[in-house]
Regions:
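Hydrophobic/aromatic-lined pockets within catalytic cores
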Residues: 26, 78, 119, 173-177, ...
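Glycine-rich active-site loop/strand segments that organize a redox cofactor
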Residues: 13-69, 185-205
Length: 205
């Protein structure tokens, strides 16, 4: 807002700000220190230690904290400016056409500049079908469904070598599941870099 005097319309298929974090599993956390994220005008997090993480590393926000931050940015900074409108639950159809996902109602808006950020959006299990076939009778769920289980299973198979797969294994172990009851299918061996080398100091931007 400080870099332009333009009026801005934010169009988002999701009902709230925060991108894919709106759909993230409840025990997700940022990869890196919180202070490395957010918008320029509103600081996010601080330089305090991670309270339940590796000693010596900075705090990493939870999914709930991330959603709360973007909600705060929208309602306490963007909307009060009078220059920003947020249209959640809306599809952009092209040529200025908007359609509300729930009602199907359409409208047309006029604009000078279109900024398309959808090419940056990644695919997450919570909103995408599995990229593999699932055998009849097998139960395949996104990671967030684990917290809704009503009874134990004989075993759990985690597919994927990334952070989501690692979070799944760690959560299951912390929930008391035996390591022998967890199968971890990795299409490749992940390269893991120590986070000690990516801890910003207060004097850095």
């Amino acid at each position: 807002l400080s870099r332009t005097d333009a009026d801005i319309v934010l169009v988002d298929r999701r009902h709230a700000p925060g991108g894919h974090w709106v759909d993230a599993y409840p025990f997700a956390r940022l990869h890196m220190p919180t202070v490395m994220y957010g918008v320029d005008s509103v600081p996010f997090g601080g330089y305090g230690p991670d309270p339940d993480g590796t000693p010596g590393l900075l705090e990493r926000a939870t999914a709930a904290e991330i959603r709360g931050y973007y909600d705060q940015v929208l309602h306490q900074t963007f909307l009060p400016s009078g220059r920003v409108r947020f249209l959640g639950g809306v599809d952009y159809l092209g040529d200025g056409r908007l359609r509300r996902i729930v009602s199907g109602k359409e409208r047309i808006i006029r604009f000078k500049t279109l900024v398309d950020t959808t090419y940056l959006e990644g695919s997450i299990p919570a909103t995408s079908p599995p990229p593999f076939d699932v055998a009849p009778g097998a139960r395949c769920v996104p990671l967030g469904e684990l917290v809704h289980l009503k009874e134990p299973n004989d075993g759990y198979t985690v597919i994927g070598a990334g952070k989501t797969g690692q979070d799944a294994c760690i959560w299951l172990l912390n929930a008391g599941v035996s390591a022998d009851a967890i199968q971890w299918v990795r299409p490749r061996e992940p390269w893991l870099l120590p986070r000690y080398g990516a801890q910003p100091g207060p004097g850095l931007p």
